[in-house]
């Protein structure tokens, strides 16, 4: 039998060059101690241990628990703000770039496609999409342009207004076609002209307005066509004319 001290005796210990795999005894049940590797054999390079510790800090619970310097957080915030202000201030839905950024790619789902955008841009895109999809949203009506009448049109309207303060539908159609205007233009002009006419009547000493509160004419306030023709005939007869006795006197003198 060979004794352990004799040369050539079998060795029952771990071979040389192999690490000692003895069980590591934990001093506590903390997560940090469980995740950290047991101390290496004596003589191991401290640089390798530091590198392994750095790798552990990048991933896992240790990275969350590790204290980071304050200036790194400021740098990250500044970088995110700079990325936000690089985008144009115009609404994203109105530009091709914004719609391309907010829409998902052909091989990429919607949420994953927009996850690379800053939070401000994502929220702005959602608000615009919600605002444009409202069913009750109405577009603002543009203000109508003021109609500019020609001199001939104004003369025709004034002449007709002197005779007829209110137009029926057939009369309005005939007047609009004769002057080259639309029915709405003739109707609007008549309404404005009647308002002016009422003011003139009241300022001229009239005690009452020639029309009712709703705008309809009162009885006997507007002359009929027969009355107008009689008034014209009376004006013609009132013109100075030669007396029948004058030519006979001249003949006598001759």
Swiss-Prot record:
It is found in: Nucleus. Residues 230-254 have a biased composition (Basic and acidic residues). One of its GO terms (molecular function) is DNA-binding transcription factor activity, RNA polymerase II-specific. Its main location: nucleus. CDD domains: homeodomain. Keywords: DNA-binding, Homeobox, Nucleus, Transcription, Transcription regulation. Residues 1-20, 204-254 are annotated as: Disordered. Coiled coil: none annotated. Residues 142-201 bind DNA. Pfam families: Homeodomain. The keyword Nucleus applies. InterPro entries: HD (IPR001356), HD_metazoa (IPR020479), Homeobox_CS (IPR017970), Homeobox_TF (IPR050848), Homeodomain-like_sf (IPR009057), HTH_motif (IPR000047). The keyword Metal-binding does not apply. GO terms for cellular component: nucleus. Expressed predominantly in the facial primordia, developing stomach, and proximal limbs. Belongs to the BAR homeobox family. Transcription factor, which is involved in craniofacial development, in odontogenesis and in stomach organogenesis. May have a role in the differentiation of molars from incisors. Plays a role in suppressing endodermal Wnt activity. Binds to a regulatory module of the NCAM promoter. PANTHER family: BARX HOMEOBOX 1, HOMEO BOX HB9 LIKE A-RELATED. This is Homeobox protein BarH-like 1. It comes from Mus musculus. The lineage of its organism: Eukaryota, Metazoa, Chordata, Craniata, Vertebrata.
């Amino acid at each position: 039998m060979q004794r352990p001290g004799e040369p050539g005796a079998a060795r029952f210990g771990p071979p040389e060059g192999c690490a000692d795999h003895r069980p590591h005894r934990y001093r506590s049940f903390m997560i940090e101690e469980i995740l950290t590797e047991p101390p290496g054999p004596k003589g191991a390079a401290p640089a390798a241990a530091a590198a392994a510790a750095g790798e552990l800090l990048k991933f896992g619970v240790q990275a969350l628990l590790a204290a980071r310097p304050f200036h790194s957080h400021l740098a990250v915030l500044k970088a995110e703000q700079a990325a936000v202000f690089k985008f144009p201030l115009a609404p994203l839905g109105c530009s091709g770039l914004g719609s391309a950024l907010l829409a998902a790619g052909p091989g990429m789902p919607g949420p994953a496609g927009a996850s690379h955008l800053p939070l401000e841009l994502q929220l702005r895109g959602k608000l615009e999409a919600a605002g444009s999809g409202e069913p009750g949203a109405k577009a603002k009506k543009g203000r109508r342009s003021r109609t500019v009448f020609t001199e001939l049109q104004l003369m025709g309207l004034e002449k007709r207004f002197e005779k007829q303060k209110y137009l029926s539908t057939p009369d309005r159609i005939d007047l609009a076609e004769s002057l080259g205007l639309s029915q709405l233009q003739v109707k609007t002009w008549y309404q404005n002209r009647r308002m002016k006419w009422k003011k003139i009547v009241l300022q001229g000493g009239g005690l009452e307005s020639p029309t009712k509160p709703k705008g309809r004419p009162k009885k006997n306030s507007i002359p009929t066509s027969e009355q107008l023709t009689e008034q014209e005939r009376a004006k013609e007869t009132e013109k100075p004319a030669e007396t029948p006795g004058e030519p006979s006197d001249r003949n006598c003198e001759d």
